[in-house]
Amino acid sequence: MKPVKIGVAGPVGSGKTALIDRLAKAMRDRYNLAVITNDVYTYEDAEFLVRSGALPPERIAGVRTGGCPHTAIREDPAANQEAVEAMLARFLDLDILFLESGGDNLAASFSPELVDVWIYVIDVAAGDKIPRKGGPGIEKSHLLVINKIDLAPLVGADLGVMERDTRLKRGSRPWVFTNLKTGEGLDSVVEWIRREVLFEGD
């Protein structure tokens, strides 16, 4: 059985790497995991995951995209496809391969040739108007994660407004509020992966 490839996209600083770090630590005892990260000029996100102990270093790979990060996950995903193939050849028993895009704007989306499903991460610190601005990530991602809910009072963001606008933009598509610093909401993401991506029951 082929591993499921899960893309994780979102603006710079929204919490993409934090989400993968938390997911890896929550799921690694039950599933065989690997991660590929994208950065424009560095391997910073991959190095963070190695330092945090999310997974063994050989299960984490970094891709330097250069230029525009969304090109590397949609229009010209060759470098990522090569990294995916190398990881799959190295670990024949993978259950899940996470692929993190470089930080981008609200227009980013993954090529269906690169991932099976994708998660889009935004954060409350960017303001409560973000969901209503829409875009492929907010409207079309398989799961929307609204992170850093603890910052809402500090930045004057109204979570009720964000919830209303998210429901309007996404319809029946799932979404979740999280505070990845404390792990709040993480269980909902894990459960979504188990039920809706891996098609597992209780």
Curated annotation (Swiss-Prot):
Location of this chain's protein in the cell: Cytoplasm
Keyword Chaperone belongs to the record: yes
Pfam families for the chain: cobW
CDD domains hit by this protein: UreG
Binding site for GTP: G10, P11, V12, G13, S14, G15, K16, T17
BP-aspect Gene Ontology terms: urea catabolic process
Single annotated GO MF: GTPase activity
SUPFAM superfamilies in UniProt: P-loop containing nucleoside triphosphate hydrolases (SSF52540)
InterPro entries, alphabetized: CobW/HypB/UreG_nucleotide-bd, P-loop_NTPase, UreG
Database matches in Gene3D superfamilies: P-loop containing nucleotide triphosphate hydrolases (3.40.50.300)
Alphabetical keyword list: Chaperone, Cytoplasm, GTP-binding, Nickel insertion, Nucleotide-binding
Gene Ontology terms: cellular component: cytoplasm
Function, as annotated: Facilitates the functional incorporation of the urease nickel metallocenter. This process requires GTP hydrolysis, probably effectuated by UreG.
Family: Belongs to the SIMIBI class G3E GTPase family. UreG subfamily.
Oligomer status and interactors: Homodimer. UreD, UreF and UreG form a complex that acts as a GTP-hydrolysis-dependent molecular chaperone, activating the urease apoprotein by helping to assemble the nickel containing metallocenter of UreC. The UreE protein probably delivers the nickel.
Name of this chain's protein: Urease accessory protein UreG
Organism the protein comes from: Synechococcus sp. (strain JA-3-3Ab) (Cyanobacteria bacterium Yellowstone A-Prime)
Gene (name only): ureG
